[in-house]
Curated annotation (Swiss-Prot):
GO biological process terms on file: cell division; karyogamy involved in conjugation with cellular fusion; spindle pole body duplication
Function: KAR1 is required for function of both intranuclear and extranuclear microtubules. KAR1 helps localize CDC31 to the spindle pole body (SPB), CDC31 then initiates SPB duplication via interaction with a downstream effector.
Region called Disordered, residue ranges: 1-38, 69-101, 207-227
Name listed for the protein in its UniProt record: Cell division control protein KAR1
GO cellular component, one term: microtubule
Native organism: Saccharomyces cerevisiae (strain ATCC 204508 / S288c) (Baker's yeast)
Predominant location category: cytoplasm
Keyword annotations from UniProtKB, A to Z: Cell cycle, Cell division, Cytoplasm, Cytoskeleton, Microtubule, Mitosis, Phosphoprotein
Subunit structure: Interacts with SPC72.
Residue list for modification Phosphothreonine: 233
Length: 433
C-alpha cells in the first residue's frame, strides 16, 4: 500500500525505503492520511447473500475488481490522485451495476420470473411428490374450502324450513295431499331455560283465580247484594233448615240401622259361644245398651245465650218423633220474629251442635257396652274359649292398628299417587308432542 503526503504529491516511496524511514515521520504520515475525509468507495462494500442476488452483471463486476487490484499492486509507484480519478471515471461511466437503475429493474424482473415460472429441475421434483405430501396438500385445500361452507343450522330451524317446503309443494300439487302423511306442526319449540323461567313465574304468581273475580267491579256489586238479601229472608231460612233437617234424619236413621245390625250380629255370636248361665246377664246389658242417655256436655259454649223452646231436643227419641219436631219448628218460627237474622243463624248452629253431642254420646255408650260384654265373657269362658278369644283379640288389635296406620298415612299415599300420575302425563306429553 502506497502512502503519499499532501505536500509532495509527486514523490513516492518504494517498499524497501518505506521500512527504513523514521518511525515518527511514518506515524505522522499515517495520521494525516486518516484525517483526510475521502469519499467511501461503494465498490468495496461486501453484502450478504440474503440481501444481494448474483447475476451476470455482478460476475463481470467481480472480475473487474480482481483485474483492478492486480493493476494497483503492479503499479505501486503511481499516486493516489490517479487512482481516485479512475474511480470517479468508473462511477460516471455506469460500470457499477448497483448504481445503474436499469440493471436493478432487470434483476427484479428475473427474480419474479423465477418465482412464478419454475425451472425444469423444480418441475421434476414436483412430479415425484410422496403420498404424505399429497395428503397434506389435500388437507390444506379442504381447510380452505371449509371457510366458505355454510354453518349447520339447529334441528328446530331445519324442521320448520322442511315443513314450510312441504306445505309449498302441497299447495302446488293438490293431488299429492292424500298420498302424503299429515305432519303435525311443532308446538314446543321452547328451550330448557325458557321453560324454567316460565315455571318460576307460575310459582311466584300462584294458582289462577276463578272467573267471577276477574269480572268488572260494577258487575260484582249486584250479585253480592242479592245474595245478602236472600240470606236474611225468612223463606230462604225455612228452605235451608228443612233441607238440613231432612239430611240429619237420614243420617240418624242410617246410622241407627247400621248400629242395630252390628249389635244383633254380636248378640247372635255371643249366644252361640256363651254358656246358659251368663245369658241373662248379657241380655240385660245388651238391652240397656239401646237406652239413650241425655247429653251432658256440648262443644259450643251455650251458657251466655240459652235457646228457648228447645226442651224437645233433650232425648234422641224426641228428635225422631214427628210431632215434637213440628212443635220445635213452630216455636223457632215464633221466636224469629223477635230476633235479628244473625241471631237466627246462631240459634240454628247451636241446635246442630247439640245434635252432634247426642251422636257422640251414643257412640260412647256403644263402646262401654262392648267392654262390659268382654269382661263378662272373660269371667265365664272356658280355657279353650279363652285361647280362641285371645287369638281373636290379637287379630282385632292388628286390624285396628292397621286401620290407624292407614288413616295416618292415607294423605301421604294419595299425594304420592297424584305425583306419579302427573309425572306420567308430563313424560307422555313430552315424547308424544
Amino acid at each position: 500500500m502506497n502512502v503519499t503526503s499532501p505536500k509532495d504529491g509527486n514523490h513516492s516511496f518504494s517498499k524497501k525505503n518505506r521500512f527504513n524511514t523514521n518511525k515518527p515521520r511514518f506515524h505522522k504520515l499515517n495520521e494525516q492520511a486518516q484525517s483526510i475525509n475521502l469519499p467511501e468507495d461503494r465498490d468495496s462494500i461486501v453484502s450478504s447473500n440474503t440481501t444481494s442476488i448474483m447475476t451476470d452483471d455482478a460476475f463481470d463486476y467481480n472480475e473487474g475488481i480482481a483485474s483492478r487490484t492486480k493493476n494497483i499492486n503492479s503499479d505501486s509507484d503511481r499516486s493516489n490522485d490517479t487512482i481516485k480519478q479512475n474511480n470517479y471515471n468508473k462511477r460516471e461511466t455506469g460500470y457499477n451495476p448497483f448504481y445503474n437503475g436499469s440493471g436493478i429493474n432487470q434483476r427484479y424482473t428475473q427474480f419474479r420470473k423465477r418465482e412464478f415460472e419454475p425451472t425444469l429441475a423444480e418441475n421434476k421434483a414436483e412430479e415425484y411428490i410422496s403420498d404424505e405430501d399429497n395428503v397434506k396438500i389435500d388437507e390444506d385445500n379442504i381447510e380452505n374450502e371449509l371457510q366458505f361452507t355454510p354453518k349447520i343450522k339447529e334441528a328446530s330451524i331445519l324442521r320448520s324450513s322442511l315443513l314450510g317446503q312441504r306445505n309449498v309443494l302441497n299447495t302446488r300439487n293438490p293431488k299429492s295431499k292424500e298420498s302424503h302423511i299429515k305432519v303435525k306442526p311443532i308446538i314446543n319449540n321452547k328451550s330448557s331455560s325458557q321453560r324454567k323461567s316460565s315455571a318460576a313465574l307460575r310459582k311466584q304468581l300462584g294458582k289462577p283465580l276463578p272467573l267471577p273475580y276477574l269480572n268488572s267491579p260494577n258487575s260484582d256489586s249486584t250479585p253480592t247484594l242479592q245474595r245478602k238479601e236472600e240470606v236474611f229472608t225468612d223463606e230462604v231460612l225455612q228452605k235451608k233448615r228443612e233441607l238440613i233437617e231432612s239430611k240429619w234424619h237420614r243420617l240418624l236413621f242410617h246410622d241407627k240401622k247400621m248400629v242395630e245390625k252390628k249389635l244383633e250380629s254380636l248378640r247372635e255370636y255371643e249366644r252361640k259361644r256363651m254358656p246358659p248361665r251368663g245369658t241373662d246377664v248379657s241380655s240385660s246389658e245388651q238391652d240397656n245398651s239401646f237406652k239413650i242417655s241425655t247429653p251432658t256436655k256440648s262443644y259450643v259454649s251455650l251458657e251466655q245465650k240459652p235457646l228457648p223452646n228447645l226442651s224437645a231436643m233433650n232425648n234422641f227419641n224426641d228428635v225422631t218423633d214427628n210431632k215434637e219436631k213440628e212443635e220445635t219448628n213452630n216455636n223457632i218460627l215464633k221466636f224469629q220474629a223477635q230476633r235479628d237474622p244473625l241471631q237466627i243463624l246462631q240459634s240454628e248452629i247451636e241446635m246442630h251442635t247439640k245434635k252432634l253431642d247426642t251422636i257422640i254420646e251414643l257412640l260412647k255408650d256403644d263402646t262401654d257396652s262392648k267392654e262390659k260384654r268382654k269382661v263378662v265373657t272373660n269371667d265365664n269362658a272356658a280355657p279353650e274359649q279363652m285361647v280362641n278369644k285371645g287369638w281373636r283379640k290379637n287379630v282385632m288389635m292388628i286390624y285396628k292398628k292397621s286401620g290407624n296406620i292407614m288413616k295416618k298415612y292415607r294423605e301421604y299415599f294419595l299425594w304420592t299417587i297424584c305425583i306419579l300420575i302427573l309425572l306420567y302425563c308430563n313424560i307422555y306429553v313430552y315424547y308424544r308432542f
